[in-house]
Amino acid sequence: GAAAIQNIGAYGMEIKDVIESVEAYNQLTFEKRTFTNSDCEYGYRNSYFKNEHHDPHIITYITLRLSKNPGFSVNYGNLKEELTKYPEVTLETIREAVITIRRQKLPDPEVLGNAGSFFMNPIITAEHFEKLKKQFPEIPSYPASEGKIKVPAGWLIEQCGFKGKNHGSVGVYEKQALVLVNLGDARGDEIALVAESIRTAVKDRFGIEPVSYTHLRAHET
């Protein structure tokens, strides 16, 4: 369900590229509905099911349309590098390479509590990026739609000194600054506080305010 809600993606591909339809149950009207791909209103890590529509819907089923002759998207730096270790590029070797990279960068949630990447990679105008490039020549980037530029949020956070640092029971993962980890007994408000301090620091330095993937909910007893 989360895949269809979030429009998950990595290395130049998103699940919206293969979703045919999504079935959802509305908890307010008690109705089931089948949404076409266009009904889902997919955008970058966004969909109809997020924001004001995220509460009523429970995703119960998705239908994917897969190609027998898929095209490969392997131009992202670390994926391209990892694939050089394989004799040929196939769907199987791409899968193995992606799994290897993710295991190196992301902690196991059964060992160290986390929700994966906490922040989205921001997409900014080319004009904004050129200004940043003059001030920070080493800033990495990837092309986005409509002539805009995607900047890795992990790099921005790392430049602000958060990577590998602990703030009480909340930590910024030492191998990937995008990931916030629960070091044992962190509460939601503590995680929110650390996330806000990261947002403020990045905005002050780069003029970019990172947006969270996650929805924090209050615990009710």
Predicted segments with their positions:
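Structural signature of FAD isoalloxazine-binding scaffolds in flavoprotein oxidoreductases
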Residues: 7-37, 41-42, 52-64
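Residue-level signal for inorganic ion chemistry
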Residues: 30, 62, 119, 157, ...
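A conserved active-site cap/scaffold subdomain adjacent to cofactor or substrate pockets
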Residues: 55, 59-61, 66, 72-80
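Oxyanion-binding "anion nests"
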Residues: 87-130
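A C-terminal functional module that forms or caps the active site or interfaces directly
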Residues: 149-162
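Amphipathic, heptad-repeat alpha-helical segments used for oligomerization and assembly
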Residues: 168-197
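C-terminal or internal capping secondary-structure element at the end of a domain, subdomain, or sheet
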Residues: 188-212
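Conserved small/polar residues in nucleotide/adenosyl-binding loops
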Residues: 214-221
